[in-house]
Structures are given as structure tokens and as C-alpha cells.
């Protein structure tokens, strides 16, 4: 099979390792434009808690798919894939290198692998049966059902992504074939994946410091303002850094406890991100925290890859 003609670079990794800065640097060095690959940075008015890059930090580099959705509206991986595919085509048609930057693994992998999404809806009865089973038994039980029927699909889908777990179970029932055995379309793009990481203790210290900086920058006020128009149970409000502050704003928790939870959840999320990228994507890893000079090696790696045919 011939390789796809269009090429994209993905910069992945856990929170707080410098993905946004590297995206700008690569774009400057390689005639690129940055496309957001973070599930929550697509929302307007969610800037501090998502660590959204600022116009000053962009240094004139075009950035796309930021602030494209209202936080009252649910977004999906299918919507992201469609929007990102169109934007990649636009950037590539300008003879610029599309550089996707983000930490939402499933969003990025759906694009890299051209995963089939948003297909024919299954019969309501099947969906309702699994939803009732989820409500009765919990998400861990639901995921175990998928793991027993389709271990490969279970490895690709987090237990917390219950909508996707149910979808995989439905497809298995509808077709009589495992979700992971469904015909897969060919990739639309040739992809080079650059991963950033660092020593775990250093990473956790950086995460804790970032949360403190977010609080000082006005995260609490940002969440309070959002709650004036966005329900607390909205998809956007489930983002780490937002959901933890809601109890304080409702007079149900102490602020220090909520901030501690943000740090804890952020550390746990970083661990899950690393696990996903290591297991699910062919990633070239670098530690720019310990070795900032390696960014030039990354430029060289990308240049050599772009020359390959």
C-alpha cells in the first residue's frame, strides 16, 4: 500500500512537559502551523484551567481548533476528527506542515489511524440494555464485559469512556464480529509522533506548580463565571481543574481540599496519558525538561522524515 501523500507531525505527552512550546518552535523551524489536539482547549472561555496557549506565546505561529465550541455544547471525537481532517488539508494545501499538539490520546489516534466513527446507530433496545447494565453494575463491570468479548478493543478504550465502551459492545452484537475486527479504512495521513516526558518526580512537581500558578492566575473566577451559563454536569465542566472547584463554589468543600484534588487528578491523568501514548502510538520520546537542547534533534528527526518517500 502506498503511503498517504500528506504528512503530519503529532506532539504528544502528559500535561506540563512543554508540548505547546515545542509546537511553536517546530512550526517556526519547519514552516508549520499548529492544530490543537486537546479535548478541552476547543472550548471558549476555558483558558486558565486547560493551559491554553496565549496569543503572546504563539509568537505569530497560526494555531487552529482553539475556541471553536461553546462549553454548553457536547463535543466528540467524531467532530474533532472531521474538523482536524479539514484543517490538515487546508494547512497542507498552503504548503505548510500540519503540527498537531495535545494530550488527548484517543482524539489523536482516531486521526492517525482514520478510525471509523459515528457510523450507523445501533437499535435503541441494545443501547438501552447496556445503559441499564452500566447504571446497575458500574463502569468497571461494563469495561470487563468488553474485555471478555474483545480484549483488543478494551485495550484501546478507557473504562471511563462508557459511551465508547457501549458502542463497541453494540457493534459486536449487531455484526457478530468483534469491534476490533471491523474493517479499518486506510490512514489519510502519514504521521510522525513526537512524545515529551520527563522524570516522574519532576513531572509531578511541575504539575503541582502549574496548578498553583493557575489558581494565582484566576482559575477560580474562571470556573465561577462559567457556572453562570454552563451546567455543572456539562461535558466541558468535567475537565480537571473545573469539576473539582464546583463543590467549593457551592459551599460544599474547602478550597484547599479542592486544589489538592486538582493536583491529584492531574497527576493521575498524566500517568494515564503516558501509558496510552506508550502502548497505543509509535512514539519517539524526548525529555526537553532535562535536555532542552534536544529540540534541535527533534527538528532534525522531522526533517529527515519529511525527506523520506
UniProtKB/Swiss-Prot annotation:
- InterPro entries to which the protein is assigned, alphabetical: Dimethylallyltransferase, IPT, P-loop_NTPase
Disulfide links within the chain: none
The entry's substrate-binding residues are 15-20
- Please verify whether the record's keywords include Plastid: no
Q: Which SUPFAM superfamilies match?
A: P-loop containing nucleoside triphosphate hydrolases
Q: Where is the site Interaction with substrate tRNA?
A: 104, 127
What does the record give as the reaction this protein catalyses?
Answer: adenosine(37) in tRNA + dimethylallyl diphosphate = N(6)-dimethylallyladenosine(37) in tRNA + diphosphate
Q: Which EC class is the enzyme in?
A: transferase
Q: Which domain of life is it from?
A: Bacteria
For this chain's UniProt record, which GO biological process terms are given?
Answer: tRNA modification
This enzyme's EC code(s)? 2.5.1.75
Q: Which Pfam families match?
A: IPPT
Keywords recorded for this protein, A-Z: ATP-binding, Magnesium, Nucleotide-binding, Transferase, tRNA processing
Q: Molecular function terms in GO for this entry?
A: ATP binding; tRNA dimethylallyltransferase activity
* Residues reported in the UniProt entry to bind ATP: 13-20
Cofactor section: Mg(2+)
Function according to Swiss-Prot or TrEMBL: Catalyzes the transfer of a dimethylallyl group onto the adenine at position 37 in tRNAs that read codons beginning with uridine, leading to the formation of N6-(dimethylallyl)adenosine (i(6)A).
How is this protein organized at the quaternary level? Monomer.
Report the sequence similarity comment from the record.
Belongs to the IPP transferase family.
Which named protein is this?
A: tRNA dimethylallyltransferase
Amino acid at each position: 500500500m502506498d503511503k498517504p501523500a500528506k504528512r503530519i507531525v503529532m506532539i504528544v505527552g502528559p500535561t506540563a512537559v512543554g508540548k505547546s512550546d515545542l509546537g511553536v518552535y517546530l512550526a517556526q523551524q519547519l514552516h508549520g502551523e499548529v492544530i490543537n489536539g486537546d479535548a478541552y482547549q476547543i472550548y471558549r472561555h476555558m483558558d486558565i484551567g486547560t493551559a491554553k496557549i496565549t496569543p503572546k506565546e504563539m509568537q505569530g505561529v497560526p494555531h487552529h481548533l482553539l475556541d471553536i465550541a461553546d462549553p454548553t455544547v457536547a463535543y466528540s471525537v467524531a467532530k474533532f476528527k472531521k474538523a482536524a481532517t479539514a484543517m490538515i488539508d487546508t494547512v497542507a494545501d498552503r504548503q505548510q506542515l500540519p503540527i498537531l499538539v495535545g494530550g488527548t490520546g484517543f482524539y489523536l489516534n482516531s486521526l492517525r489511524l482514520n478510525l471509523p466513527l459515528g457510523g450507523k446507530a445501533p437499535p435503541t433496545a441494545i443501547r438501552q440494555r447496556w445503559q441499564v447494565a452500566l447504571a446497575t453494575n458500574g463502569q468497571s463491570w461494563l469495561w470487563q464485559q468488553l474485555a471478555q468479548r474483545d480484549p483488543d478493543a478494551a485495550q484501546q478504550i478507557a473504562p471511563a469512556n462508557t459511551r465508547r465502551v457501549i458502542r463497541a459492545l453494540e457493534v459486536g452484537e449487531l455484526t457478530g464480529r468483534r469491534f476490533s475486527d471491523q474493517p479499518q479504512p486506510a490512514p489519510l495521513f502519514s504521521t510522525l509522533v513526537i512524545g515529551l516526558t520527563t522524570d516522574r518526580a519532576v513531572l509531578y512537581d511541575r504539575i503541582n506548580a502549574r496548578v498553583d500558578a493557575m489558581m494565582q492566575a484566576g482559575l477560580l473566577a474562571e470556573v465561577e463565571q462559567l457556572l453562570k451559563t454552563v451546567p455543572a454536569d456539562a461535558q466541558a465542566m468535567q475537565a480537571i481543574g473545573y469539576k473539582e472547584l464546583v463543590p467549593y463554589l457551592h459551599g460544599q468543600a474547602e478550597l484547599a481540599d479542592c486544589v489538592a484534588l486538582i493536583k491529584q487528578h492531574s497527576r493521575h491523568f498524566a500517568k494515564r496519558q503516558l501509558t496510552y501514548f506508550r502502548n497505543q502510538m509509535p512514539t519517539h520520546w524526548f525529555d526537553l525538561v532535562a535536555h532542552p537542547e534536544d529540540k534541535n534533534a527533534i527538528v532534525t528527526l522531522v526533517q529527515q522524515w519529511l525527506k523520506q518517500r
